[in-house]
């Protein structure tokens, strides 16, 4: 099991120098990859290009590029450029974001998300393979049929023969799509106890493409806080989990609350949402059951975290994308180092 580090959103509570120090320390410690996110602040590719110029061996991934933010052709152009600049170290992670960001920020309808994702990934793959892009799907047609557009192919070649594409997915149908079209799955709120079900969904999609999961990378993003004080470690996790389960999306459409519900915490997730959407963030965090926190994070004493790492390996995780969670940069570096020791 390879270790990755999630940097999250650039500039959100950390400086550029701190982000760079974290990545360079991860590279020194032998971490396999560093991942950068985007929402409606910093963009991921600019940060990734900056990191590529200041690192030498660590792989760099988008976690994720938002599908509504770019045409598939622009995503392929960006990915190929980053792969060349990094010397073949780029991993392309894609995700739909959510209806609030897609429609409120990017002006893109969130309708037919499965069909749109299928069309998008198919065109990105065609472009990265330097095939002439002539495609007719349910939500996308290239070239447009009623104008002067012509089928084009990418004029540059990625450094890697097959640039790996990862899909962020949570629901069963999206997982199957990842298994069918992608090289890896970016999981979130990942439970090792439910890994068998995840693998079944991924395998069903892979079978549609006439393949199995051999070489497919299961790569969940997992929050980490190592501390001898278990209660304090759980409390570090509460604001982050409450944000996603309670506040990411609307009451009617929150993928993270849905995931908690699939794990058997539907009532607790509803309580977290009630508090969070009413502005009671501390109460939202307090409503998170300890059992849910332990299920989807690595937190607590070293022995407990070591057991969690073993469970993730047993669950078939190929790349564990860790998010060292702490209130200061110094503490984040400490978490990064401690985890490397425990995973060795």
Positions of predicted regions on the chain:
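Active-site-adjacent structural elements that line small-molecule/cofactor binding pockets in enzymes
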Residues: 1-344
């Amino acid at each position: 099991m390879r270790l990755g580090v999630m940097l999250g959103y650039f500039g959100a509570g950390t400086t550029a120098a701190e982000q760079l120090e974290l990545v360079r320390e991860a590279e020194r410690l032998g971490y396999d990859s560093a991942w950068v996110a985007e929402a409606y602040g910093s963009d991921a590719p600019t940060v990734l290009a900056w990191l590529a110029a200041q690192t030498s061996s660590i792989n760099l991934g988008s976690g994720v590029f938002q599908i509504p933010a770019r045409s598939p052709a622009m995503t392929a152009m960006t990915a190929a450029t980053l792969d060349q600049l990094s010397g073949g170290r780029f991993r392309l992670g894609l995700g739909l974001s959510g209806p609030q960001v897609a429609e409120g920020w990017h002006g893109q309808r969130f309708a037919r998300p499965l069909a749109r994702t299928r069309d998008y990934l198919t065109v990105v793959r065609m472009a990265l393979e330097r095939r002439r892009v002539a495609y007719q799907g349910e939500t996308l047609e290239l070239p447009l049929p009623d104008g002067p557009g012509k089928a084009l192919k990418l004029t540059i070649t990625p450094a890697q023969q097959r640039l790996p594409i990862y899909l962020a997915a949570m629901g069963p149908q999206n997982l199957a799509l990842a298994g069918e079209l992608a090289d890896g799955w970016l999981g979130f709120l990942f439970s090792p106890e439910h890994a068998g079900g995840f693998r079944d969904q991924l395998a069903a999609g892979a079978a549609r493409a006439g393949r199995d999961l051999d070489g497919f990378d299961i790569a969940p993003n997992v929050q980490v806080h190592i501390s001898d004080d278990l209660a304090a470690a759980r409390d570090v996790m509460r604001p982050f989990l409450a944000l996603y389960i309670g506040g990411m999306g609307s009451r009617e459409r929150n993928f993270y609350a849905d995931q908690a519900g699939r794990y058997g915490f539907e009532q607790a997730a509803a309580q977290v949402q009630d508090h969070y959407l009413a502005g009671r963030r501390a109460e939202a965090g307090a409503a998170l059951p300890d059992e849910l926190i332990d299920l989807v994070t690595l937190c607590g004493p070293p022995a407990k975290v070591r057991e969690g790492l073993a469970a993730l390996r047993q669950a078939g995780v190929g790349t564990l994308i860790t998010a060292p969670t702490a209130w200061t940069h110094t503490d984040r570096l400490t978490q990064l180092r401690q985890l490397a020791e425990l995973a060795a």
